[in-house]
Amino acid sequence: MKKAEVVIQLHKPDASEMLFFFLCGVIISVPLTLFIYQYTDSLLIGLDAFTIALISRAFFAPFIEEFSKAYPLFYRHGETQRSIFDLAVLVGLGFGIVELLTYVSVLGTPIIYRLPALLFHPASTSIIAYGIATKRPLPFYLFAVLLHFSNNYFALTLTSPFQLLGSIFVVAVAVFTSWRLRTRTKEKIVI
């Protein structure tokens, strides 16, 4: 008697699926982040302004934002390691664009200080995606959180131009790590 063989076709995301994941970064990750912030910031009432900023932006923000960006990646079916990784870049890019526009147009932050984040968010999200694709999400999530913490900590504690230099350094580490991890992904289905 022959054993039954199951063949699973590799799934490559088409343009509409890629757009879906980009929009997830815009319409799911950003609102989820803002919703969680609403509750975490209320826990800090009574502290001085710098301490609130440090705890909120350097500690809470990395955990919240990295989770919010990775969240849509758990909605996938029959994806390969490589496609999960690539979809993560799109989620991070969607998140990064909305964050850039918010900081520049609403908060009046000079665009030069926000441009590194446009590279950081896709890179950090893809680092987490590598962990998801290889069934080890926690260490890669925590590494992305550490990078995010470092970037935000430098932004809060360093003075200009060192803020920008610190950000460029952290972004370079994130982008390099993302690139190295992408070379390790395979067209192997993730079940």
Regions found by a protein language model. Name each.
Residues M1-I191:
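Hydrophobic alpha-helical segments at protein termini of multi-pass membrane proteins
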